[in-house]
A protein has these predicted regions:
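Typically the conserved alpha-helix immediately C-terminal to a functionally engaged Cys/Sec
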Residues: 55-71
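Hydrophobic beta-strand anchors of alpha/beta hydrolase catalytic cores
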Residues: 43-44, 78, 112
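The canonical Cys-X-X-Cys-His
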Residues: 52-55, 112
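Non-catalytic, surface beta->alpha helical segment in thiol-disulfide oxidoreductase systems
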Residues: 102-143
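Thiol-based oxidoreductase modules, predominantly thioredoxin-like and allied folds used
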Residues: 23-25, 68-94
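Bacterial Sec-dependent N-terminal signal peptides
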Residues: 1-23
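A short beta-strand-turn-helix
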Residues: 24-42, 72
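Short active-site neighborhood of thiol/selenol oxidoreductases, capturing the structured segment around
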Residues: 38-52
């Protein structure tokens, strides 16, 4: 009986403390289709979350903040291009990174590219992305 009660309490604890995750599209084509269907903007995240120090800080301070997660999931379709420390120039992730970097003229990591559902550029944000308040303020201002 004690064992059953223990597992019930453990199960309840796990599910009440679990935080929602940012919903990410697996590829850009899917992100575009979802944005049109859901009438949301597209947020392209250019990052190197394993090795880029500002990217690591952005992930910790912004993308792991529950307020940001909730806001982002409600307002954006997110497509992340996360460059690994050792990338191959022929890889899909590197090709995506190169394409978006050139198209939206940003060399900064991290960068956020905000598009409307028709892919019209709203903004490229590459400053103060490690600061939760500044990032939220900018995204809400552009919404």
């Amino acid at each position: 009986m004690k064992r059953v009660l223990f597992f019930q309490v453990l199960f309840l604890f796990i599910f009440t403390t679990a935080q929602a995750q940012i919903k990410k599209s697996p590829d850009y084509e899917t992100a575009k289709a979802e944005a049109i269907k859901e009438k949301k903007d597209i947020l392209i995240v250019l990052t190197g979350s394993e090795w880029c120090k500002p990217c690591v800080k952005m992930k910790k301070n912004v993308f792991e903040n529950q307020e940001f997660v909730d806001y982002a999931n409600e307002h954006f379709v997110i497509f992340e291009v996360n460059l690994p420390r050792h990338w191959d120039m022929n890889s899909k992730v590197y090709q995506d990174y190169s394409f978006f970097k050139e198209k939206y003229q940003t060399n900064a990591l991290p960068s956020l590219v905000l598009l409307d559902s028709n892919e019209k550029l709203k903004a490229v944000i590459s400053e103060k992305l490690t600061l939760f308040d500044k990032t939220m303020e900018k995204l809400k201002e552009l919404k």
